[in-house]
Amino acid sequence: FVDTSDLDAVRKALKPNTCAVYLETPANPNLKIADISAVAALAHGYNKDIKVICDNTFASPYLQRPLELGADVVVHSATKYLNGHGDVIAGFVVGSAEFCNEVRMFGLKDMTGAVMDPFCAFLILRGLKTLEIRMQKHCANAKAVAEFLYDHPAVEKVYYPGLIDHPGHDIARRQMRDFGGMLSFEVKGGRAAGVKLVNALHLVTVAVSLGDAETLIEHPASMTHSTYTEEELA
């Protein structure tokens, strides 16, 4: 694993047996931004057969089009923004017709039997009709929250690519329509302060997901990563 926002690290990680480069941008949970075009150019320049796969869940296709930036394959958790209502579990793989046919006929479908049920498909199609207006509001809300937290005396650091001092701000501005609806932040006082904050909220739901109709918050160290050691969390 390498930090795909670091092009030198990506370059050094490429090996003769590399068959794919997988990146997520914006990345979960630190909102790091990878330059999709630059990563794709590096990978394809090293070996034209390397597949560049981009997880576009945090951006959605409304905000970012990785295929147009050089990626070969795009994956989405359709559970999130694409559906938008927190009531399905689904995923999308987007690519060339040739690649998708290989996946459907000779790949994952044959090995796992992974087929979306009709009602999930209906709900996602319904959600896609409002993706544009939902993403516009998600972005506006996230920016407002990020700017509020940025100036708050109890907040140590805010991770949001829409902030001008975010290290990936310029790349995000170039390859995204807007900066997304997700942000992370650190509060002063460490883990105990983070847990106290999450437990004190009333209008925000404590849950592990995103892209829902409600505002959600999670504290990874005590939730999704609660079994990790302090060294692993660091």
Language-model features, listed with the residues they occupy:
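Conserved PLP-enzyme active-site core in the AAT-like
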Residues: F1-A154, Y159
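Conserved C-terminal alpha-helix-loop-beta "cap" of PLP-dependent enzymes
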Residues: V155-A234
